[in-house]
Amino acid sequence: MNVSFSIAPYFFKERRAKLNSFRKRKVEIVAEIDSLLKNSSSLAIVEYRGLTVNELEQLRKEFKSAGVLSKVYKNRLFKIAAENNGYLDLQTDLVGPNLFAFGTTDAIAPAKIIAKNAKEQPLLILKGGIYDNQVVSAAENALISALPSYTEALTMLASGLQSPLKQLAFGLKLLIDEQKITA
């Protein structure tokens, strides 16, 4: 009987140390999520239930090539970090298996990539997220995915400015060729 009591303190001490290491790891993960929420320009939450490993890996490769950081976290730990940063409205989207895509360089890239892949893979569901430090719903995230990226917007602006000048130059060239005006 005394033997069992002498083993018990050792057993509980070891178990307590193991639980403390798990708790430390969870605190580190919450700090990592907290840092990502503060330093990224956007966040898109996507549910990936039913996707194969190959489909998920392909999605992650697309994220990586676009400069988007994608991670899978436990919803409870993400919820704690979101509350710490004042994003209380995200809690409704934190159900089921979620992939968190953080836009580090282009704020629209995560939503764009998810929307593009959701057309090919209907099991991929774009949920809410964060854009411009505001919590957005799934519908708003879908609208954001339709916006042009920064480089696309600049290209559209440049072509819009260049088109009238091209037409003017072409018209003047025709008038010169017909010799209605002199150069």
UniProtKB/Swiss-Prot annotation:
GO terms for biological process: translation. One of its GO terms (cellular component) is ribosome. InterPro entries: Ribosomal_uL10, Ribosomal_uL10-like_sf, Ribosomal_uL10_bac, Ribosomal_uL10_bac_type. Keywords: Ribonucleoprotein, Ribosomal protein, RNA-binding, rRNA-binding. Part of the ribosomal stalk of the 50S ribosomal subunit. The N-terminus interacts with L11 and the large rRNA to form the base of the stalk. The C-terminus forms an elongated spine to which L12 dimers bind in a sequential fashion forming a multimeric L10(L12)X complex. PANTHER family: 39S RIBOSOMAL PROTEIN L10, MITOCHONDRIAL. Forms part of the ribosomal stalk, playing a central role in the interaction of the ribosome with GTP-bound translation factors. This is Large ribosomal subunit protein uL10. It comes from Mesomycoplasma hyopneumoniae (strain J / ATCC 25934 / NCTC 10110).
